[in-house]
Swiss-Prot record:
Family: Belongs to the ClpX chaperone family.
Protein name as it appears in the record: ATP-dependent Clp protease ATP-binding subunit ClpX
Reported uses of this protein in biotechnology and industry: One of 8 loci used for multilocus sequence typing (MLST) in Borrelia burgdorferi.
Lineage of source species: Bacteria, Pseudomonadati, Spirochaetota, Spirochaetia, Spirochaetales
Cleavable signal peptide: none
Length: 430
C-alpha cells in the first residue's frame, strides 16, 4: 500500500474508492491521494472556471478603455490602432453576450478587423494581448501557406483546427476565440485583370476564406491536411469567431496618395501636398484595398480598418525596456534564475535599436539581436559559480568579437551597476 512519510493512504481523497479498488493507480502528495477519474473532473472544473469569461454581463466584460489600458502595458505607441481594436473587440463580445440580437430582434453582424502596418510594428502582439485579456482561445495563421482546395498547400479549414487545439479540443470554447491571419496582403490578386490561369494562392484563397470569416458551419479534419470523403470531421460554427487580418501591404500608401491627388472632393491642394506617403494610410478606403488586389467581397468581410505606424528610434527604445513583458525584462529574469544580474549601458541600448533600424526589422528584430549578443554569455555564465553580474556594453553591441562583461566576486561593488539597470527600466528620452 502507498505510503507518504510513514502514513498509509487507503483511498482516493475525493471519491473514496480504495487504493486496492483502483489497482494502486493513484497520485499521492502530502498525504492526499487522487485517482485518474477525479483528476480528470478537477481538470475540467478548472478549465470551465478559467475559460468561460463570457457567460454573463456580471462576469465583467472589459470596457474599451480598460482594454486599451491593458494594451498600453504591453504595446508601445500605435494609439489609433489600440482604440480601434479595443472598441471592435468590446463590441464583438458584447454582441455574443446578447446572442447576436438586440431587444427588437435586429441581428447584429460581426465586424472582423484588418490591420495594415510594416513588419515589426506590433500587429500580432496587439491581437495576442487582447485575446489573453479576454481569456479566449487564440490562434495565428500564415496566409502564405494557404491554397485553394485541391491544390498543394493548406486548406483554410486548418486555421480553425489551430484554434480548436488552442481551446484544448473544446469546440464550444473555440467558437468564441480569435484568429489572427498574418501576411494577408500576400494573397492579393496578382493583377486587376482577369487571367486565364488560376490564382490558387491569391484570389482562390480569398474566395475560400470568405465563408469562414463571415460565419459558417465548417467541417475540420481532426488531423489537419486535406479532407477525405470517409474521414470523420470536427464541426465548428465560425459565426462568433473574431478574425483579425494583418499585413504590411507594401505599396498601398502610394495607391492611397494617388487616389487623393486625383480626387477633387474632400482635400484642398495644400492638404494634398502635406500628405506624406508614410501618413497616407490614415485616409485608407475600401477602393484602395481592392486596387491593391483584395477582392471586394473579401474587403467587405473586414469592415474595421486600422493602420500601424512605422516605429521610430524612441519607440524602439521604449519597446526594449518599458512594457510589462519587455524583451530586456525577460532576459533580466532569465539571468536572475542563475542568480546573475543583467544590466545594460545606456549607449548599448541605443546601439541595439540602431541595428534594428538598419536591418528594417522593427520591434521583431530586437529579440534576435539580443539573442545573438547574449548567446556566448548565456553559455558561459551557468558554469561560473561566482558570476554575479553581466554588463552589456556599447562595444559588445558594435563589435561581434567583444562579449558583454561577466563580473564576479567583489567586482559587483562598482556603483554604476545598479544605476545601469534603473536606466534601462526608466529610459530617459532626453
Amino acid at each position: 500500500m502507498a505510503r507518504v512519510k510513514g502514513q498509509k493512504v487507503k483511498e482516493c481523497s475525493f471519491c473514496g474508492l480504495s487504493v486496492a479498488e483502483l489497482g494502486g493507480n493513484v497520485v499521492i502528495s502530502n498525504g492526499v491521494a487522487i485517482c485518474p477519474e477525479c483528476s480528470k473532473i478537477c481538470h475540467n472544473l478548472f478549465k470551465e472556471k478559467l475559460c468561460k469569461p463570457l457567460d454573463s454581463k456580471s462576469n465583467g466584460l472589459p470596457t474599451p478603455k480598460q482594454l486599451k489600458d491593458h494594451l498600453d502595458m504591453y504595446v508601445v505607441g500605435q494609439e489609433d490602432a489600440k482604440k480601434v481594436l479595443s472598441v471592435a473587440v468590446y463590441n464583438h463580445y458584447k454582441r455574443i453576450l446578447k446572442n447576436n440580437k438586440y431587444d427588437n430582434g435586429i441581428e447584429i453582424e460581426k465586424s472582423n478587423i484588418l490591420l495594415v502596418g510594416p513588419t515589426g510594428s506590433g500587429k500580432t502582439l496587439l491581437a495576442k494581448t487582447l485575446a489573453a485579456e479576454m481569456n479566449v482561445p487564440f490562434a495565428i495563421a500564415d496566409a502564405t501557406t494557404l491554397t485553394e482546395a485541391g491544390y498543394v498547400g493548406e486548406d483554410v479549414e486548418n486555421i480553425l483546427l489551430k484554434l480548436i487545439h488552442a481551446a484544448h479540443g473544446d469546440v464550444s470554447l473555440a467558437e468564441k476565440g480569435i484568429i489572427y491571419i498574418d501576411e494577408i496582403d500576400k494573397i492579393a490578386k496578382k493583377n486587376e485583370n482577369v487571367s486565364i490561369t488560376r490564382d490558387v494562392s491569391g484570389e482562390g484563397v480569398q474566395q475560400a476564406l470568405l465563408k469562414i470569416i463571415e460565419g459558417t458551419v465548417a467541417n475540420v479534419p481532426p488531423r489537419g491536411g486535406r479532407k477525405h470523403p470517409y474521414e470523420d470531421t470536427i464541426e465548428i460554427n465560425t459565426q462568433n469567431i473574431l478574425f483579425i487580418c494583418g499585413g504590411a501591404f507594401v505599396g498601398l500608401e502610394n495607391i492611397v496618395k494617388n487616389r487623393i491627388n486625383k480626387s477633387s472632393i474632400g482635400f484642398s491642394a495644400i492638404e494634398k501636398k502635406n500628405i506624406r506617403e508614410d501618413t497616407s494610410l490614415k485616409y485608407l478606403e475600401m477602393e484602395d484595398l481592392i486596387k491593391f488586389g483584395l477582392i471586394p467581397e473579401f474587403v467587405g468581410r473586414l469592415p474595421v480598418h486600422s493602420y500601424l505606424e512605422k516605429l521610430n528610434k524612441e519607440d524602439l527604445l521604449r519597446i526594449l525596456v518599458d512594457p510589462q513583458n519587455s524583451i530586456v525584462k525577460q532576459y533580466y529574469h532569465m539571468f536572475k534564475m542563475d542568480n546573475v544580474e543583467l544590466v545594460f549601458e545606456k549607449d548599448a541600448l541605443e546601439s541595439i535599436v540602431d541595428e534594428a533600424i538598419l536591418k528594417n526589422t522593427g520591434a521583431r528584430g530586437l529579440r534576435s539581436i539580443l539573442e545573438g549578443l547574449l548567446k556566448d554569455v548565456m553559455f558561459e555564465v551557468p558554469s561560473i559559480s561566482k558570476a554575479k553580474k553581466v554588463v552589456v556594453t556599447k562595444e559588445s553591441v558594435l563589435n561581434a568579437d567583444v562579449n558583454p562583461l561577466i563580473l564576479v566576486g567583489n567586482a559587483i561593488k562598482k556603483p554604476w551597476a545598479k544605476e545601469l539597470y534603473e536606466i534601462n527600466l526608466k529610459y530617459d528620452k532626453k
